[in-house]
Amino acid sequence: MDSKGRNVIVCDNGTGFVKCGYAGSNFPTHIFPSMVGRPMIRAVNKIGDIEVKDLHVDDLMVGDEASQLRSLLEVSYPMENGVVRNWDDMCHVWDYTFGPKKMDIDPTNTKILLTEPPMNPTKNREKMIEVMFEKYGFDSAYIAIQAVLTLYAQGLISGVVIDSGDGVTHICPVYEEFALPHLTRRLDIAGRDITRYLIKLLLLRGYAFNHSADFETVRIMKEKLCYIGYDIEMEQRLALETTVLVESYTLPDGRVIKVGGERFEAPEALFQPHLINVEGPGIAELAFNTIQAADIDIRPELYKHIVLSGGSTMYPGLPSRLEREIKQLYLERVLKNDTEKLAKFKIRIEDPPRRKDMVFIGGAVLAEVTKDRDGFWMSKQEYQEQGLKVLQKLQKISH
């Protein structure tokens, strides 16, 4: 709470999950899928052994509840690539977040810190503020850039954040607390695309996943089994010539499937976007290009503080593969293959264990530090007087 007794909450609305809680806390109070489910015509009368009539299915279900009953629901995701695509559904998610089932707060007596990816469309930000003040009537609000929050959580003020969540990956250099928007790179490949690609690879093996609920099933399987190959050619030989990589996985309906080379082939799309028909460089080359585009004086500082953040950086093998590829690019393009000079090149990739929640943790730190600084927050009164011009306050603070 701030000095006037108002609640201060942080809400990190990701494409895949909502992470929300109070300022100053070490982890989110609630984490739940950012999904809305509507019942299909229920031709199926049983799920497993449970009679459907025993289950209470509302007209509309959100978050955990929608996830648990997903085989009965048509599931939709209000956000795509970090941008809200369906505002009505997004409001259902927020109703659920602020309502009795989760945060259970009175918005009129609450300050809220929201997050957004760098390079997000202004329209998205404007609509978000409008909804917060007009629909919910929050006392004050602030919108922070996710990459900067990640660095706060890591206790740094300069570095490069590679943030890969469910909907978008971005590489954002930050120098002395300022995000450098002209150097920020965005890659529209993230967790959801890798899940889609895994579904496609499994289809080629003869396993069909075509119901909207299966998407969630494959996502959970991906998190258990996928990894990033250090040496792709070697991994491919292992997959073709041996059964070392094969793992059995039991689906919720009891079927057992065998997964082999798909375990590293699916997340490989992060490094080779052409695998899923996306043009452009992969995550390692993008990080290298970003740092090389920065001022020569700050490059060493950036190479030494590459911080991973977001659920899609949790694959085993990702940090070592990133380091290897960036070193290789530096050797070829900067040192012109002079291997003796490579010893002087310092690179460090930080992979904090709690990186799934890094953005929230940084937000909780920022909200706690600024909770009594009225000049920091956009108040409802300012919004009523100035309308969307109030957003200019953000620019003054963050740049």
From Swiss-Prot:
Which Pfam families does this chain map to? Actin (PF00022)
Name the GO terms of the biological process aspect: actin filament organization; Arp2/3 complex-mediated actin nucleation; lamellipodium assembly; positive regulation of synaptic assembly at neuromuscular junction; regulation of filopodium assembly; terminal button organization; wound healing, spreading of epidermal cells
The record lists ATP as bound by 165-167, 219-223, 310-315
State any GO CC term: actin filament
Q: Quote the SMART domains the UniProt record gives.
A: ACTIN
Which Gene Ontology molecular-function terms are recorded? actin binding; ATP binding; structural constituent of cytoskeleton
UniProt subcellular location: Cytoplasm, Cytoskeleton
Keywords of this protein's UniProt record, alphabetized? Actin-binding, ATP-binding, Cytoplasm, Cytoskeleton, Nucleotide-binding
| Biological function | Functions as ATP-binding component of the Arp2/3 complex which is involved in regulation of actin polymerization and together with an activating nucleation-promoting factor (NPF) mediates the formation of branched actin networks. Seems to contact the pointed end of the daughter actin filament.
Q: How does it assemble?
A: Component of the Arp2/3 complex.
> What's the family?
Belongs to the actin family. ARP2 subfamily.
Tell me what this protein is called: Actin-related protein 2
Per the UniProt entry, what species is this protein from, by scientific name? Drosophila melanogaster (Fruit fly)
